[in-house]
Amino acid sequence: MPVTTLHDTAVRGFASDNYSGVHPEILAAIAAANDGHQIAYGEDAYTARLQEVFAHHFGAGAQAYPVFNGTGANVTGLQSMLPRWGAVIAASTAHINGDEGGAPERVAGIKILNVPTDDGKLTAELVDREAWGWGDEHR
């Protein structure tokens, strides 16, 4: 069965990084990397090259951890900063609150503490209302 385009290529969507295709050069690089076999789980030549590039730009101690999309990056970032019972204080309109589909709580096990605001910005007073029980994993 021939492959056909099933969508209107003139339509643009900016609600998510998952809406658009990749640049043709990226797709060509993926196709080239797809030829043949490589060891898996980060032991391949492409991951080694990625680490070299990151070390060059960000210093010898920098390491890259590739993830599938923005949600994966956000969950990984939060997971790296918080204990499993940790929490993030976020405005009710924050991206992490409304657009991640519960992934931080489901995957990372952290809690998103939803703070209603008039302008989408947290103030010290709003944070203080939620920031009680530090050091208590049962909070």
What are these regions (language model features)?
Residues 108-139:
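PLP-dependent aminotransferase-class I/II
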Residues 1-29:
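N-terminal amphipathic/basic leader segments beginning at the initiator methionine
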